[in-house]
């Protein structure tokens, strides 16, 4: 289990100067050729998402104005707050800030031939399904994960096991993603 606080994470500026990324975790850890990766991006200007051939991207708007995502003849989608949207990352996808204001989103990418992610929003205590990887990010409220207290802009990632996240206040929201490995694949096979 690895814990993080978004306010203390290192920031990587994009080459096109349209935004920045805070990498939460990758699997395998610290590998450039990853099977899955979670990150938080701040988008300050219209631009294109980076291409990642062979990957699926699920993007969830955390804050800021809605964002229009366009990919040639494949889709035109308005990304609304806390509504995950999936697309293959090998296509050119243009992002347009509809309100002209900066937005922040959660991204999870998985290798299409190895694993699949599911992103959800939780508003009550729950236990993960025992997948072989996952990430949680507190949108608001106070949540307990094991012996750790997680509050707004904090979270954790793990590479196996079941975990209970307990809401400690009457209201709260938490984004979570679990990684499921496709038949014939396992994180145990990774060197």
From Swiss-Prot:
InterPro entries: RmlC-like_jellyroll, RmlC_Cupin_sf, Uncharacterised_HutD/Ves, Uncharacterised_Ves. Gene3D superfamilies: Jelly Rolls. Belongs to the Ves family. PANTHER family: PROTEIN VES. This is Protein Ves. The gene is ves.
């Amino acid at each position: 289990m690895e814990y993080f606080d978004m306010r203390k994470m290192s920031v990587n500026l994009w080459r096109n100067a349209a935004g920045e990324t805070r990498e939460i975790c990758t699997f395998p850890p610290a590998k450039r050729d990853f099977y899955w990766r979670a990150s938080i991006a701040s988008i300050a200007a219209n631009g294109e998402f980076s291409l990642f051939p062979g990957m699926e991207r699920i993007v969830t708007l955390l804050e800021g104005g809605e964002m229009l995502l366009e990919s040639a003849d494949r889709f035109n989608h308005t990304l609304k707050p806390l509504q995950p949207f999936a697309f293959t990352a090998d296509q050119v996808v243009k992002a347009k800030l509809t309100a002209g204001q900066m937005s922040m989103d959660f991204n999870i990418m998985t290798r299409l031939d190895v694993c699949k992610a599911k992103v959800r929003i939780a508003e009550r205590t729950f236990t993960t399904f025992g997948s072989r990887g996952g990430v949680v990010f507190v949108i608001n409220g106070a949540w307990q994960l094991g012996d750790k207290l997680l509050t707004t802009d904090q979270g954790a990632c793990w590479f196996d096991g079941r975990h209970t996240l307990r809401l400690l206040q009457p209201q709260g929201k938490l984004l979570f993603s679990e990684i499921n490995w496709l038949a014939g694949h396992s994180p145990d096979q990774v060197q």
